[in-house]
């Protein structure tokens, strides 16, 4: 019998999951850092968010965290008319 994988329903249901290709773990990191909505990321730098995440979480952020934060900031600042080519994690590597 296989173990069921633990699912983070709160992170999955958060507004951050409206961002295309947003990893669930990064949504969880943002929630743990005290952010509750996408608009709160406007004007922030990805590096400062990453530092806040490191301070607020016991987990070590993965390699996809910084590109995902850059994508989230871009989406928050351009939600009404984003460039589709930039709504991809690979565009932020």
What are the residue ranges of the model-derived segments?
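C-terminal extensions
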Residues: 1-93
């Amino acid at each position: 019998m296989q173990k069921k994988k633990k699912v983070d329903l709160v992170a999955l249901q958060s507004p951050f999951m409206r961002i295309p290709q947003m990893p669930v773990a990064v949504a969880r990191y943002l929630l743990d850092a005290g952010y509750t909505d996408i608009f709160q990321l406007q004007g922030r730098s990805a590096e400062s968010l990453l530092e806040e995440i490191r301070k607020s979480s016991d987990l070590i952020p993965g390699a996809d965290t910084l590109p995902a934060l850059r994508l989230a900031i871009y989406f928050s600042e351009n939600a009404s008319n984003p460039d589709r080519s930039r709504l991809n994690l690979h565009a932020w590597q």
